[in-house]
Amino acid sequence: MTLSAYNLLSKEQAAKHLMDCCGSTQWVSQMMAYFPFESEKQMVHLATSVWYEQCDESDWRESFTHHPKIGDVKSLTEKFAGKEQAGVAVATAATIEALAKANTDYENKFGFIFIVCATGKSATEMLQLLLNRLQNTIAEELNIAMGEQQKITLIRFKKLLTEADFAFLKVSQITTHVLDTAVGLPGKNIAIKMQSQQNGIWQTIAQGITNIDGRIPDLLPQERILKPDTYKMVFDTGSYYKQQNIKTFYPMVEIMFNTFDDAHYHVPLLVNPFGYSTYRGS
């Protein structure tokens, strides 16, 4: 469907499609105030600004209820819990059971299910993410989960409007890359938290695990621009080296950096068991 074809739908049909993209009544209502949309770019811009500026915790939580549980044994086994969660298709029975338990623990702690944009992620990676995020506070998880929902929303836009032009979408404003200089290879499966100061306390606003190339290409949702400020990237190098039975002098690496505008910022880490360095990448 093209955007032009979508704009010809009735308001009821258009709203239903939006609800399928993001299950927040407030978000859909605010989006429909601008229907029909002028362009794909306007649609994405509105989706982002409405989500972050005109929705609140109750709206975010409502959207979470429209997702199946990634860790639900039955849905994992029978349906693999939806298209965005296709990465769990190769999961072993043990991994599925572990996901089920971790998801239950997560829901019991935070009061909503684990939300993650699972496209391209393996079941093992999702389990690692889930276990890592279980250590966060409720405030942190709300920030992270709403960001994951926004990623999912944009993916669903593309699936809804298959003939539309989304070429304008850029990569995450903040990206990272880890290189293990001891072996000259990417640092894969390293848990990374991105944090900002809120009321004088560092809180996680995005979280991920480096892929086989040592990168997290989707740390933030596309078109999500952070306000110019000081941020921090926290790398769990201790667990990375522990998995390899290697002792490291640096169990955790923290890199603070400034953003000044809406430009792309790349924060790489070059690390070995006894030293590390960073620079502003491109």
Predicted regions and their residues:
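Alpha-helix boundary/capping and short turn/kink residues
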Residues: 24, 36-40, 120-123, 135-139, ...
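C-terminal non-catalytic interaction appendages of large macromolecular assemblies
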Residues: 89-161
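Aromatic-anchored, charged helix-turn/loop surface patch used as a conserved interaction hotspot
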Residues: 1-10, 16-21, 26-102, 152-160, ...
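Residue-level signal for inorganic ion chemistry
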Residues: 31, 114, 267
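Compositionally biased low-complexity segments at domain edges in trafficked proteins
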Residues: 263-282
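Beta-strand-dominated extracellular/periplasmic modules and repeats
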Residues: 166-260, 266
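Short, loop-centered acidic/histidine patches that primarily coordinate divalent metals
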Residues: 115-121, 236-238, 272
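A general structural signal for short secondary-structure boundary/capping elements
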Residues: 114, 160-167, 278-282
